[in-house]
């Protein structure tokens, strides 16, 4: 396993910064200004290869490319009908299949995506170390309780929709040699009633297990967001390690978002990697134990007025992670 970075900025300056920090593998989050995506959403193979060559000039390999299925509120997504079962679902699937084939032709090893209808929810910020602030979620402080225009979206309806999609895209991914890495639901929603009538089928470890069984393939796995998994747990310190062990042994962890929280299920704040409830040294020890060989990427970081673009925060997270990897290698 090794450090990686998620890049939404592909400028020379940003790539130089990443290379100087020892980053040799990245997930590309943006298609903007790359020429990869046409106006109709379909992808072109030559610009993907051109981007791979450009990254290589900085000593960087593209391990993962963003498939473009966002975690935003469904009405703001490019494919609002995909997980909701709307009339545009089949057209969206056809386009995604075409893009998976393009990724395979360009030898992109992995595509990441989200299964989220209601978006990433937070309720504010809390004071943190040295004047930084932490993103916070407390379900008791969430004020919008009305149903979305979708009406009630119980878990089984969402499962039916998800399996419909997976049955059509996962076999294609397997044929093309492209792994599909889904992000768990951030945050977990109340398990009994959901929120605004919407349930989160990837908001529990059991839901994640069901996902990989639904269309069982070595090409269907996770962008394993360790922070999001911690948000599902009542005891993140122990439960996160158990989840790493389970999905790692199943070889369904395709990349890792490495971030830490304080708190847990329905009430948490996103903190620095070294001051949360999950022991990162122990977490990395378990990744090594199960044979994980992919990227460990910083994800959400605290905000600092002294670091408006979060570059120093990411630098700290990368260096901290690299130090832990090196320490483990000598143990």
Regions found by a protein language model. Give the residues of each.
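Basic, amphipathic N-terminal segments that precede the first structured/catalytic domain
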Residues: 18-35
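Structural motif corresponding to the early beta-alpha repeats
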Residues: 32-163, 174-175
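Short, well-structured secondary-structure segments
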Residues: 25-30, 63-64, 181
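Histidine-acidic metal/acid-base catalytic patches
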Residues: 1-4, 9, 14-22, 53-57, ...
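Short beta-strand and adjacent tight-turn residues that come in two discontinuous sequence segments
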Residues: 28, 113, 297
